Amino acid sequence: LIGYKLESGFRRGDGLHLTLYWQALGQLDQDYVVFNHLTGEDGVTYAQKDNPPVDGYYPTSRWAVGQVVRDRYDLFIPADAPAQAYVIETGLYLPATGQRLNILDCAAASCAGGDRVALYRFEIGGG
């Protein structure tokens, strides 16, 4: 993951329009699935989108080394989301086993447990 763009009003009922920018540092011999989670500080996942990259049209095994791949996702903040802090996290996993790909450069990324990246944190207030 070399970058992302996020568009939203960050209010209950709003969409989270997320564009991820991936770049393969080496040839990938397996096809991974991308996961995107909206998780509250209570540990509950309130929105989730797991999908092969580019809606399945461009599997990771076909990525060329150095090529930048643009990958869009839409999640929605539930209308009844409780007032608390939230984090949007992303990562990759093997669909057959569920094993997540480890993050290699945690200094450059906001790693959350070594197998996902915390992209953005925000609060939803009361009322």
Where are these regions (language model features)?
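C-terminal luminal/periplasmic domains and tails of membrane-associated envelope-modifying transferases
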Residues: 1-127
